[in-house]
Design a protein with these regions (language model features):
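Hydrophobic alpha-helical segments
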Residues: 65, 88, 144, 158-160
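Short conserved micro-motifs at the rims of enzyme active sites and ligand-binding pockets
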Residues: 82-84, 144, 154-156
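A structural signal for isolated positions on well-ordered beta-strands in alpha/beta enzyme cores
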Residues: 120, 141, 167-170
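Active-site ExK catalytic segment of metal-dependent nucleases
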Residues: 139-149
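Catalytic cores of nucleic-acid endonucleases
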Residues: 147-172
């Protein structure tokens, strides 16, 4: 359907970025309601194209209530649907950052299904961690992706303080 196609384009454009369902509806024409959009996002996820990573919280209920962070399963889907030239991706730090973060996210998603991992993101106020990966109840890793330009404040110290058993990983 046209709405699913529009959702895919929107999600690929905003890969590695949080977007609430309300904002999605504002961006999509003939959006219907959030239930329909969430269902289409689930179908795109099952097709291995695009998913909405949930915000990490120890409580499952709060994870489900969070706004998703879009993530493509393959960065070629992101670049092909955007129409943005390679030189622009290389020249604009924000675009390059989203591309690099999407590449790391795509790899994590590929490993997640093979190894039974949970892939999330985390933010408290302005402090943020790009990815939180869990395996079972006893293994937690916080991953920060660096791509050249400093973005906001890293929340790594805050996350590790709240979750002292978590491992710290910096990519880039």
């Amino acid at each position: 359907p046209a709405l699913m196609r529009a959702l895919f384009r929107l999600g690929a454009t905003y890969s590695a970025q949080e977007l609430s369902y309300t904002k999605m509806l504002g961006q999509l024409q003939d959006a219907g309601n959030t239930v329909t959009v969430a269902h289409y996002l689930d179908l795109l996820d099952k097709a291995g194209m695009l998913c909405g990573i949930q915000k990490y919280d120890a409580k499952e209920v709060r994870r489900r209530k969070s706004s998703p962070r879009f993530m493509v399963y393959d960065t070629s889907l992101m670049t092909a649907s955007s129409g943005i030239e390679k030189s622009r991706y290389l020249g604009e730090p924000d675009l390059r950052g989203h591309l690099v973060e999407s590449a790391v996210g795509a790899r994590l998603l590929a490993r997640a299904s093979e190894e039974g991992l949970g892939v999330y993101w985390w933010r408290e106020g302005t402090k943020e961690v790009d990815f939180v990966v869990s395996k079972g109840f006893d293994s937690l890793s916080a991953i920060e992706v660096k791509s050249g330009k400093e973005k906001g404040q890293s929340g790594m110290a805050d996350f590790l303080s709240a979750h002292p058993s978590a491992k710290r990983i910096v990519v880039g």
